[in-house]
Amino acid sequence: MKWGAGLLCVLILLVAVMIGLLIRSQNQAADQPDYFEEEILVFENADSVSFPEPGQIVFVGSSSVRFWDSLTEGMRPLPIIQRGFGGAHMEHVLHNLDRVVLPYAPRAVVVFVGVNDIGSGKTPTHVGNNFRIFVDRVSASLPQTDIWLMSMKPSKARWDKWSLMREVNEHLIQLARENEHVFFEDTGATLLNSQGTPDDVYIFDGLHLNEEGYTRWINHLKPVLLARYPEFS
């Protein structure tokens, strides 16, 4: 009994330490625009070997884009450049925009980011303003490139933040209303059940999507993108 109690205490301590390290890592990422430099260099090294053809569709954003293993195959025949990295905030996307979006001269950019921003305590207005900067910069450099804004992702792990994320969605909707080349897609709605709560489409952490979750995203986005870009059909 004593050994069992001692082991339990050790396990609890280890879990507490791991959670503390995770929170510290997230805070460091939020405060350092170049936090994901190593991942960006991986993209650039791959580009140095074979640079993507212009006119494709770039998916950029945080780990939900990075872990989207079925993206390229699931979106065929749409040509996809996948540029998700780490637990990125919009600040990280803006910091690396000249390296992971603009050089490819894409036909369209699909962006999913923002949930980590809200999770770290940033306000919906702050996140919305950063999205506006993103749109302005892409539009200034690539005026004919479409920008697709994926809605915030509801999740079990951050359900307490959902009302704030919905406020971010309102900022994104407004951006789409103001710009003819900007579109808002409510992909987050595909992850909710009939009761309006997160469905069983997440891995063990309750935050990242499982295969079913990504399939729902593909089933939502692919027809919309093909309708907009019939040349890829």
PLM features per residue range, with description:
Residues 54-70, 88:
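Catalytic nucleophile-elbow at a beta strand-turn-alpha helix junction centered on a G-D-S/GDSL motif
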Residues 156-233:
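Catalytic His-Asp segment of secreted/periplasmic serine-dependent ester chemistry enzymes
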Residues 65-79, 92-128, 148, 152-156:
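Oxyanion-hole/transition-state-stabilizing segment in secreted/luminal serine hydrolases
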Residues 125-134, 164-169:
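Charged helix-capping and loop-helix junction motifs
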Residues 142-146:
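A short helix->loop->beta-strand "cap" motif at the edges of active sites that frequently abuts
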Residues 50-53, 74-75, 103, 141, ...:
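Extracellular/periplasmic catalytic domains that process cell-envelope and extracellular macromolecules
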Residues 59, 80-82, 184:
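Conserved beta-strand scaffold positions in the cores of enzyme catalytic domains, especially
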Residues 1-57, 73, 228-233:
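N-terminal secretory targeting modules
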